[in-house]
Amino acid sequence: MINGSIVALITPMNSDGTVDNKSLENLVEYHIAQGTDGIVAVGTTGESATLPAKEHIQVVQQTVSFAAGRIPIIGGNGANATAEAIELTKGLSSVGVEAMLGVTPYYNKPSPKGLVAHYKAVAQSTDIPQILYNVPGRTSVDMLPETVAELASVSNIIGVKEATGDLSRVSKLRSLCGDDFLLYSGDDATAREFLTLGGNGIISVANNIVPKAFKAMCDAALAGNTEEAIAVEKSMQSLFSALFCEANPIPVKWAAHQMGLISKGEIRLPLTELSSEFHGLLLEAMKNARIEV
C-alpha cells in the first residue's frame, strides 16, 4: 500500500462555486512532478462536507483520470450518516481508487460500539481497502486505539489516519493492531516524530504547497535519518502553525492561489476567504519555508 508523503488535496473552485477542473489537473501534475507518494481526493481538506455525493464522486473520478495511474489516489468516503458513507463508497468503488479514507461520523458523536458498527457496514459494502480517520478536533468524537484494534480485524480495513497529535498513540496502535496495519499521521506539526515512532506515512495539509520538502522529510524519517528529517522539518514549522490560523482549508487554499497553483482561492460556504489580518502571517511563514510567491 501507500507509504510516505501523501497530500490531502484541496479542491479548487471557480468564482461561481463550481469545481475548477483545470486547476485540479494542474495540482495533480504538480504533485507527480514533485514526487508526492499519494493523493487523498475529497477528504476534509478537499471540502468533502460541502460537496454533495454525486459531485464528490465526480471530483474523485476526475482526479483518478488526471493521475492516469502515475500516482495512487485515495478517495474520501466519510459522512456522518452511515447510509451516505455507503453510497459514497459504492460510487467510488468503480472509479479506480487505491483505497478510501473515512472520517469518523461527525456531530452525532457515536459511541465506540456505534463506530465499530458504522465502519463494518461501510467496509462490507466494497472490496476496496479502507482507512479509518480520527480527528476529534473536527468531529467531536475520539476513536480510541482499542476501537481501532477491533476494526483492524476486518479484512479490508488496512489502516488509520490519526490526527490527535498524541504521539503516545503510535506505539499503542502498533501494539494493538500489529505490524501490517498502516499508521498515518494527520497532524503536520508532529508528523516527523510520528514516523520515527513507527508510522508508515503522513496525510498532510502543508504538503499541498511544500511537497518536495515534505517528501524529503518523510523519506529521511522513514530511513532513520533523524537529523536530516529534523533539519527539513525546521524550515516548515512556522508554516504548520500558520496553515491553521483559520479553519482548514481556508489558509492553504489562499496560499496555493498566491503560488499560482490554482486560479482562484475560492471556498464554499459556510467557510469564507482568509481574513486579511492573517495574510502577513501566512506570507512570512511561506517565506520561511522557502516558498516563492
Swiss-Prot record:
Molecular function terms from GO: 4-hydroxy-tetrahydrodipicolinate synthase activity
Q: Which cysteines are joined by disulfide bonds?
A: none
Places the protein is found: Cytoplasm
Q: Name one GO biological process term.
A: lysine biosynthetic process via diaminopimelate
Assigned EC number:
4.3.3.7
Amino-acid positions noted as binding pyruvate in the UniProt annotation, renumbered to this chain: T45, I203
Sorted alphabetically, the keyword list is: Amino-acid biosynthesis, Cytoplasm, Diaminopimelate biosynthesis, Lyase, Lysine biosynthesis, Schiff base
Residues flagged as site, Part of a proton relay during catalysis:
T44, Y107
Say if the entry is tagged with keyword Repeat: no
The record's similarity note reads: Belongs to the DapA family.
What protein name does the entry list? 4-hydroxy-tetrahydrodipicolinate synthase
Q: Which organism is it from?
A: Shewanella piezotolerans (strain WP3 / JCM 13877)
